[in-house]
């Protein structure tokens, strides 16, 4: 909610016009002439007068006592009426800083009786109070002069993000940076030399078709333009340029994209926002207001006084502002429900859109720029919100621009001014009343039953313009946007605007509270506390993850202590120390790896952070520090669990001092790891890149830690990297703590090593320090790394921006582009013309069976949310649908309408069989036969509200893929392709055929383009019954009209189509044949025909006593929703659901349901010989085809994979340079073993980690496609694995060539092929392992935790840390159950297992290499064929589990 008060330090400081948009009670400000009794006490007989006067005197005394308080205390005290035990209303003193929820609720009930009616009066009371004492309200006038914005794009096929293009584009960018190659990017102009004035106290509507530049204009005015765009021109606020104030705090930009933490409730999100944005100058205002009222003897209304004082108190965890915003945005009903996300059930899309609006309204900004705030909202809700905005603008003198896609006529009438934007040019800017006159000036007229807003968005379109030509005596000629724009300057409104520009704004008139000069709304300490509280809340909501991590490290410590049991751990010799080395290294790995989950959490929270950072909610350090500080206790707990369980059971040095030193070392390592992963997450910014960078960093850190390869064996040119590795300091600290203990002080008899004791020999053999003070140096170094990584984390948050963008790409070039556009235009014109009243265009009708759908007494329940139980709501189930009945018939277009939260999508999900949880009751029949979901999926289509598509394929490929799998086998390829082309033409997708779909809000298609693709994907399936959930949501009026014409054409072919729809215009609403209207609570209140011009609908509701008549020209859809709101029901004491159930219309509806629930004579139930439209092999082929193109165009995944492969190969080659040529002593063999271990484990782990985010994105698409009956899970699994194997094969080839040559292995064909084979199969099973875990867990965060747990086990039992013969007998079986152990067996044995050389072993002497491998490690060369076969078995096992997981597990909650 906007601030009610001004923004400056000036005590007179000015009332900001934006208080809550909530209403007040019917009494307001009370002047000196009224007493408190006049406000609250009813008039009574004289017999009670004396006692009432005593009460009044008491009230006056208490108010006087408040006025005598010091200013600081006085502004925190208020008086609120309370009902006493005897039923009397009494004023009670109350501390406004400690308002309980019941107090806020009580005040809300007094101020807000009916929001729709009382809001204006409430705002006037607030304004009157400040006007009465002469406090001036600040105003902001925004001017933009000659603004042009342009951006760079790549042209033609080079814009597609294939691996080849990304490589080429990267090389070009590097060469271009050094001016060695001219840039091949093209400039596109988004805004073209536009100028205008946005005035306070006038609400401005911004209209324009998609890609017209609306969002760019709003972002430019708000000072939030993308850094990659170039802007010229001048923008001023009250004559001041951006450098003179802080635009992000002076104004508020409300984005199209709904980014919120799904773990927080609606109220918590708004409270946090209000807390960070601050109160502006409300406190100074209240101080001055209170002083002036005291001087003039004015006693304010206690309710108004309490409200204004409460919202003026800074630093509150929760504010009344939140309660008011919840009320006026209609979010009070879901205030305590989680926002939700992709995998977590939460509020609806419309409610989330309102939450995005509310998040900025709770702040004190004086100018508001709102970008498409009505997406997903019904027309009634949009109207109410815009009405509140209008009251705010007019009463409080706020500056406001609102961009809307499909404003209904009544909503359009609320605006004062219009800015019409098209092709980056302003066609019209000025009063709404003159806009039709302007177009009549050009010869165009708006039809009678056409919304003006719809007309304005279509009249500039070449495809739609001609139908509005009104000068019949003159031939029509297309009037271009440039012609309109230039003609506006000669129109009287344009001339007036030009004359206003000639007079510069007088800076001296700028109110001191108008422009904000402080960067943040509250103090640094308050910002830190707010972020700290939120971080603690998020940790509690994600407690499962932290509990899971704790359980994981507990289990792992129990396993470790049984592997390295102290009875098996001997002390005193060098060979005994080797086993302790393995135990300490593994412990270090686990404590460090347990912090890997921090990387996923960081990436997950970045989108919300970037939004709030750019809006100046808080500085980056305030976001980063709580995440660091709150993890310190967790580090202590995890380190304590590990040390407590393993230290003495393994048999480390027994003294208490060394125990606590070891605990300190592990704690520091864990803190360093958490800090490192947070930093890497902020650097990577996406799951794939972060996982790649994270795994690569771990590889370097671990390899150079001193255990895998000794320091003395590292080449001199890599020594610096050894000292840069944090792992080295952790490893040094723990091994020094152990081996400098007295029990390792046996004298050393090996003269080749200059050391006095066995402990020093163990340290020096691997290059560790032996001086005791190095332990503390290492501790300080680890803490220093932790501080450094946290500092880098803050810097990354401060300076890096999110990856990905939504810029357009030029798909065609030159003449080809023009031809393509012409073809698309001509086809569309033909379609639009042919879909007129002369008769529908049926086009190519593929064979299908017309089907009806009837349902009755449908009830749907979900388990009661814990948040609602916490609020005192009783019951175990929450009912969302209540006795819903209806029928959908072939050739009949049915609208499913209701306010947000009425249950429209819920009903559609139930009918379509898309619900994955909850409890369903009732009957559903298809053409008289009980619905069978398997066959129903074959004959139905479902256009979901959320446009879910594979992001890395093109539009054409998406449609071909859908048609390929869903059309029957008797339709040949040519017919199928022609049908796809026709559908693309119907939905106007031909110009976008080669565009990448992309991720919503990140890249690729815009919202409206994505919506049209969703519809086309279902239409190409040729379904008999089509469900469309909000098909026009997010579309402008013209795009919505195109979509609805497509829908109408579909219905005219005899199909059954039902659409939920939020905000239909008159012509769209009246294109429907029948209506099913629902009210909040999931009850039907109308089901029947609309009639001509909605006559039957209007007659039905007007016949209800008390319902106001519809006005001429009013949208029947909006009127219908307005008169059936809960507040109207309450006012008229009606229940529309009860009225409907007692009506003749209900009885006719029941008769229809009964008829359609009975099979017609001679009919047969829908039956298919096979479950799926295509055969198993075709499904596999089609899925592989899509996955092939998806992977080819996913450079973030595959380009990074190959880059990391090359970098890791080269680095390992340098670290282990020619290590394979030396097998003279035990350390040489350990180094080679370490090289093979690192080469397999780390790149394999990288594959397993990076594949999971890619699988997570595709899994969401898989859920939709599986529900649509496109394919079985097995072909999908096989195809995805096949594509991965293809890339793994190439990856292994690159890696093997680099590594094999640099580490110095023998160049024989057999050994090279064995090396390649084991590397390839290991990379495949690692990748499949990551895919398998993704299929078995709800999200990739949990999958990542599970992966780190099992990788730790694989690491422990790989045979490197503890050879198989030394593993206790009770754990030896798990060695054979560890894939990495088999790979190391194969690699080591194939490379050196056939050598006859001798190896020197300390304390033993020379021994034959084959004997050493057999007795020391359990390796035999003759066992290689078995090892090779087992690798295939691992691959098949993981493939089977992956397929099983995606087939039987569904983590989507609907």
Swiss-Prot record:
It is found in: Membrane. Keywords: ATP-binding, Membrane, Nucleotide-binding, Repeat, Transmembrane, Transmembrane helix, Transport. The keyword Cell inner membrane does not apply. SMART domains: AAA. The chain crosses the membrane at residues 544-564, 584-604, 623-643, 663-683, 689-709, 716-736, 775-795, 1199-1219, 1231-1251, 1285-1303, 1312-1332, 1342-1362, 1367-1387, 1423-1443. ATP 2 binds at residues 898-905. Residues 175-448, 853-1106 form the ABC transporter domain. Residues 812-838 are annotated as: Disordered. It is a multi-pass membrane protein. It holds the Pfam family ABC2_membrane. This is ABC transporter G family member 39. It comes from Arabidopsis thaliana (Mouse-ear cress). The lineage of its organism: Eukaryota, Viridiplantae, Streptophyta, Embryophyta, Tracheophyta. The gene is ABCG39.
């Amino acid at each position: 909610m906007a601030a009610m008060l001004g923004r400056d330090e000036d005590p007179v400081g000015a009332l900001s016009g934006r208080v809550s948009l909530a209403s007040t009670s019917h009494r307001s400000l009370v002047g000196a002439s009224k007493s408190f009794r006049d406000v609250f006490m009813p008039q009574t007989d004289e017999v009670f007068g004396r006692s009432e006067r005593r009460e009044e005197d008491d009230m006056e005394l208490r108010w006087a006592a408040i006025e005598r308080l010091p200013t600081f205390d006085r502004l925190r005290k208020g008086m609120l009426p309370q009902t006493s035990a005897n039923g009397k209303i009494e004023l009670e003193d109350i501390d406004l800083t400690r308002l309980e929820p019941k107090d806020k609720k009580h005040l809300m009930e007094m101020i807000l009786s009916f929001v729709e009616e009382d809001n204006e009066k409430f705002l006037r009371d607030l304004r009157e109070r400040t006007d009465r004492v002469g406090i001036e309200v600040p105003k902001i006038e925004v001017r933009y002069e000659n603004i042009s914005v342009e951006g760079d794009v790549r042209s033609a096929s080079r814009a597609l993000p294939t691996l080849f293009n990304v490589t080429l584009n990267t090389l070009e960018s590097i060469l271009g940076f050094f001016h060695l190659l001219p840039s091949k990017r093209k400039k596109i102009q988004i805004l073209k030399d536009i100028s205008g004035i946005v005035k306070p106290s006038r609400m401005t509507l911004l209209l324009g078709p998609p890609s017209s530049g609306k969002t760019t204009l709003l972002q430019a005015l708000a000072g939030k333009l993308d850094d990659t765009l170039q802007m010229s021109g001048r923008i001023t606020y009250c004559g001041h340029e951006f450098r003179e104030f802080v635009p992000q705090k002076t104004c508020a930009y409300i984005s199209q994209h709904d980014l919120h933490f799904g773990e927080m409730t609606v109220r918590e999100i708004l409270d946090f926002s209000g807390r960070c944005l601050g109160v502006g100058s409300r406190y100074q205002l209240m101080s001055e207001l209170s002083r002036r009222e005291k001087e003039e003897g004015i006693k304010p209304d206690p309710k108004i006084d309490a409200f204004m004082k409460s919202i003026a108190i800074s630093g509150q965890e929760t504010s009344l502002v939140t309660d008011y915003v919840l009320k006026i945005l209609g979010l009070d009903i879901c205030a305590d429900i989680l926002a939700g996300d992709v995998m977590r059930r939460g509020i609806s899309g419309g409610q989330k859109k309102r939450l995005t609006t509310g998040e900025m309204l709770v702040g004190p900004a004086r100018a508001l720029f709102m970008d498409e705030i009505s997406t997903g909202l019904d027309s009634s809700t949009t109207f109410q919100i815009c009405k509140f905005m209008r009251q705010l603008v007019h009463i409080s003198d706020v500056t406001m621009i609102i961009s809307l896609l499909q404003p209904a006529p009544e909503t359009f009438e609320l605006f004062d001014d219009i800015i019409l934007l098209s092709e980056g040019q302003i066609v019209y800017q000025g009063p709404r009343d003159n806009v039709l006159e302007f177009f009549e000036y050009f010869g165009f007229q708006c039809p009678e039953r056409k919304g003006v807003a719809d007309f304005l968005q279509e009249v500039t379109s070449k495809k739609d313009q001609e139908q509005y030509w009104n000068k019949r005596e003159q031939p029509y000629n297309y009037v271009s946007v440039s012609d309109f724009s230039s003609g506006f300057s000669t129109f009287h409104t344009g001339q007036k605007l030009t004359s206003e520009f000639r007079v510069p704004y007088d800076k001296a008139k700028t109110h001191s509270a108008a422009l904000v000069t402080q960067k943040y709304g509250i103090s640094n300490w308050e910002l830190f506390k707010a972020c700290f509280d939120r971080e603690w809340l998020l940790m509690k909501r994600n407690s499962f993850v932290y509990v899971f991590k704790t359980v994981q490290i507990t289990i792992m410590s129990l396993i470790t202590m049984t592997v390295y049991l102290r009875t098996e751990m001997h002390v005193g010799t060098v060979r005994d120390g080797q086993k302790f080395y393995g135990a300490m290294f593994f412990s270090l790995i686990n404590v460090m790896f347990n912090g890997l989950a921090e990387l996923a959490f960081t990436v997950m929270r970045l989108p919300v952070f970037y939004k709030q950072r750019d809006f100046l909610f808080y500085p980056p350090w305030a976001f980063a520090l709580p995440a660091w500080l709150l993890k310190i206790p967790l580090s202590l707990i995890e380190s304590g669990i590990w040390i407590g369980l393993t230290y003495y059971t393994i048999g480390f040095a027994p003294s208490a001092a060394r125990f606590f030193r070891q605990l300190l070392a592990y704690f520091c390592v864990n803190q360093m790891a958490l800090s490192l992963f947070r930093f890497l997450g902020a650097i990577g910014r996406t799951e794939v890149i972060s996982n790649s960078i994270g795994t690569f960093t771990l590889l370097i850190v671990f390899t150079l830690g001193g255990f895998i390869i000794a320091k003395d064996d590292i080449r001199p040119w890599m020594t610096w990297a050894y000292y840069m590795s944090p792992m080295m300091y952790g490893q040094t600290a723990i091994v020094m703590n152990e081996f400098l203990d007295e029990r390792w002080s046996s004298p050393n008899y090996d003269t080749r090593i200059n050391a006095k004791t066995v402990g020093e020999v163990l340290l020096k053999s691997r290059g560790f320090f032996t001086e005791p003070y190095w332990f503390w140096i290492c501790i300080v170094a680890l803490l220093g790394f932790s501080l450094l990584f946290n500092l880098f984390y803050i810097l990354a948050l401060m300076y890096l921006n999110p990856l990905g963008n939504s810029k357009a790409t030029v798909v065609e070039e030159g003449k080809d582009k023009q031809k393509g556009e012409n073809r698309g235009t001509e086809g569309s014109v033909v379609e639009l013309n042919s879909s007129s009243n002369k008769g529908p265009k049926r086009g190519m009708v593929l064979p299908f069976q017309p089907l009806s759908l009837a349902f009755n007494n449908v009830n749907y329940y979900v388990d009661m949310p814990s948040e609602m139980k916490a609020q005192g709501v009783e019951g175990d189930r929450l009912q969302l649908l209540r006795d819903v009945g209806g029928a959908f018939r072939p050739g009949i277009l049915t609208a499913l309408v209701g306010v947000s939260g009425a249950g429209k999508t819920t009903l559609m999900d139930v009918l379509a069989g898309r619900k994955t949880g909850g409890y369903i009751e009732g009957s559903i029949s298809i053409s008289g036969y009980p619905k069978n979901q398997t066959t129903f999926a074959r004959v139905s289509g479902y256009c979901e509200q959320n446009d879910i598509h594979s992001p890395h394929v093109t539009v054409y490929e998406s449609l071909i893929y859908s048609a390929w799998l869903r059309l029957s086998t008797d339709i040949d390829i040519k017919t199928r392709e022609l049908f796809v082309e026709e559908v693309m033409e119907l939905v106007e997708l031909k110009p976008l055929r080669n565009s990448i779909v992309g991720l919503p809000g990140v890249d690729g298609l815009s919202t409206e383009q994505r919506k049209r693709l969703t519809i086309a994907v279902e239409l190409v399936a040729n379904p008999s019954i089509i469900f469309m959930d909000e098909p026009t949501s997010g579309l402008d009026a013209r795009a919505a009209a195109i979509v609805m014409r497509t829908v109408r054409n579909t219905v005219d072919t005899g199909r059954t189509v039902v659409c939920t729809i939020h905000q239909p215009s008159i012509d769209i609403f009246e294109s429907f044949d029948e209506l099913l209207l629902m009210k909040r609570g999931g009850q039907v209140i109308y089901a029947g025909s609309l009639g001509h011009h909605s006559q039957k609908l209007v007659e039905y509701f007007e016949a209800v006593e008390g319902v106001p008549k519809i006005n001429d020209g009013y949208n029947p859809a909006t009127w219908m929703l307005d008169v059936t709101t809960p507040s109207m029901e309450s006012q008229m004491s009606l229940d529309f659901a009860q009225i409907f159930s007692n009506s003749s219309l209900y009885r006719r509806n029941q008769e229809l349901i009964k008829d359609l629930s009975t099979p017609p004579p001679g009919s047969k139930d829908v039956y298919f010989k096979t479950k799926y439209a295509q055969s198993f092999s075709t499904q596999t082929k089609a899925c592989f085809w899509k996955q092939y193109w998806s992977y080819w165009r996913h450079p973030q995944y595959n380009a990074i994979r190959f880059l990391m492969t090359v970098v890791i190969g080269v680095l390992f080659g340098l670290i282990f340079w020619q290590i394979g040529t030396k097998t003279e002593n035990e350390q040489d063999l350990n180094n080679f073993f370490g090289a093979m271990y690192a080469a397999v484990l780390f790149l394999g782990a990288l594959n397993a980690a990076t594949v999971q985010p890619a699988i997570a994105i595709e899994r969401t698409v898989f859920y939709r496609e599986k529900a649509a009956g496109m394919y079985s899970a097995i072909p999908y699994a096989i195809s995805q694995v096949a594509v991965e194997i293809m890339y793994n094969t190439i990856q292994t080839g690159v890696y093997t060539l680099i590594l094999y040559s640099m580490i110095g292995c023998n160049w024989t064909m057999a050994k090279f092929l064995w090396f390649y084979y084991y590397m390839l199969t290991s990379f495949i099973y690692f990748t499949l392992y990551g895919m398998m875990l993704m299929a078995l867990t709800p999200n990739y965060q949990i999958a990542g935790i599970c992966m780190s747990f099992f990788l730790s086990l694989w690491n422990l039992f790989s045979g490197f840390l503890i050879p198989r013969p030394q593993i206790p007998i009770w754990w030896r079986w798990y060695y054979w159950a560890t894939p990495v152990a088999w790979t190391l067996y194969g690699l080591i044995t194939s490379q050196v297992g056939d050598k006859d050389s001798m190896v020197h072993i300390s304390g033993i002497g020379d021994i034959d290499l084959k004997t050493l491998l057999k007795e020391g490690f359990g390796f035999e060369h003759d066992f290689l064929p078995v090892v090779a076969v087992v690798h295939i078995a691992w691959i098949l096992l993981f493939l089977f589990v992956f397929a099983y997981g995606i087939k039987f597990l569904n983590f989507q909650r609907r």
